[in-house]
Structure formats: C-alpha cells, structure tokens
Amino acid sequence: MKFDILTLFPAMFEGPLTESILKRASEKGLIEVALHNIRDWAFDKHATADDAPYGGGAGMVMKVEPIAGAIEAVKAKRPNSKVVLTTPCGRPFNHQVAEELSREEGVVIICGRYEGVDERVRTLCVDDEISLGDFVLTGGEIAAMVIVDAVSRLVPGVLGSDESAQYDSFADGLLEYPQYTRPPEFRGEKVPDILLSGNHAEIAKWRRKEQMKRTLASRPELLDGIEWSKADKKLFAEVEKADQEKVAR
C-alpha cells in the first residue's frame, strides 16, 4: 500500500511514521509513505504556496498550481492512486471508508491549511474528500495521519494477527467487546468468570452480547440496518430485554 502525502509541513509526520506498527509495516515493505512538500512545486523564488482570497476575507488560501504540480508528479509514478483531500466539507471518515481506501493501489492525501484550498483543486484534481468530523483542525496533517493509520491496519500482515482488525470496533458494525488481561482481580474488580473458563463457545457468545450491550448503550444509531443472523437476533433480544428491565428499575 502506497501513501503519498502532500503537505506544507512534512516534519509533522516524523513521530507517527517512525514508531510502533507503522514503522514495522514500513520496514517490512507492507506500506510505503512518501512525504511531498507542496512548496517544491511553487513557481516563485519565495516558494509561495498560498495567497489572499479573491473577493476579500480573512486568512489565506492554498494556491492551485503547486498542488496540481505535486499531484501530477506523483501520478506520473503511480497513475492509479486515488487523490483525497482532507477537508471539513468531506464525507465523514469511518471504518467503511478506511476499508474502501485499503483496496486502492495507492492513496494521495492533500493536507489542507489556512482557509482551505483553491476550489479548482477540488474540481480538477480530487477524487474524494474526507472529514474526520464536525470540527475544524489547524491543518489536514493530523487527519492524514489518522487516515494512514486506520487504512494501514487493514493491510494484510500489518497487524500481528489479521484477526486483530477483524474484531476491532466497527469492523462488523458494532463496538468492540471489553478486553481484560492479568491480574485476574484489581481493586475489587474481577475479570468475568466466563473468560477464565476455557469454554470458547461460551466466551464467543459472551463477547458478542457485550458488543451488543456496549453499542446499544453508547452508539445505538450503529444498530440501524444491521442484518442479524438467527443466533444474533436471539442474543440481541436478550440484551434489549435486560436493558429495558434496567431502565424500569
């Protein structure tokens, strides 16, 4: 999986890309992240990459020529890469979007800054626009880091076990079940007996119910449209009944 990141501040990526899972994935050749300074494609001696907005207004706007030049240079090497702009105007980033991107040959991420990019970047150069949520960041670099991290986890071999991604929150539409490790008791809080039983069928059933309980309590909107299996329908009915009884008390 190849990521090309177009940014005015490439040094911001040094920490996230040189530690932990992303570092190991890069060393193994499972992912490749190339940083491109947009100013390298500016035309003037000052490497100007932004200018005042037409029509007036506060702040500066990122110029179209340097961004277009950077994209063209990258696409000359990787013509099938998908070009993504990080922007509050984009579609919300979630697990499903990460899965979509993980199936691409490569992804080019444009990190927006200041008051945003010239509209012609969006109309002429971009395949997709992605937002982390209903808030505004100082720039798109942090959003790009999140996208690279989330997508890389889905690349085969990046995680120690492919099952790790399979059971992540949102992978099947539900939040992840509670996790425990040693010690078996801490400050009066014990690990559920079922997890110590060695009965893998019952453990799987408990974990599935806990996913349902946690999702119902914290993110009930995620339950809309889920196609339950017959066994899941029975489990969810038990979860709903217990929840209703709890509310009625």
Swiss-Prot record:
Protein localization: Cytoplasm
EC number of the protein: 2.1.1.228
The UniProt record lists the keyword Ubl conjugation: no
Keyword flag Repeat: no
Reaction(s) catalysed (UniProt annotation): guanosine(37) in tRNA + S-adenosyl-L-methionine = N(1)-methylguanosine(37) in tRNA + S-adenosyl-L-homocysteine + H(+)
EC class: transferase
GO molecular function, one term: tRNA (guanine(37)-N1)-methyltransferase activity
Binding-site positions, S-adenosyl-L-methionine: 112, 132-137
Pfam families: tRNA_m1G_MT
GO CC terms: cytosol
Domain of life according to the entry: Bacteria
Major location (coarse): cytoplasm
GO biological process: tRNA N1-guanine methylation
Key words of the record: Cytoplasm, Methyltransferase, S-adenosyl-L-methionine, Transferase, tRNA processing
Subunit field text: Homodimer.
Function text: Specifically methylates guanosine-37 in various tRNAs.
PANTHER family documented for this protein: TRNA (GUANINE-N(1)-)-METHYLTRANSFERASE
Membership in a protein family: Belongs to the RNA methyltransferase TrmD family.
Name assigned to this protein: tRNA (guanine-N(1)-)-methyltransferase
Organism: Geobacter sp. (strain M21)
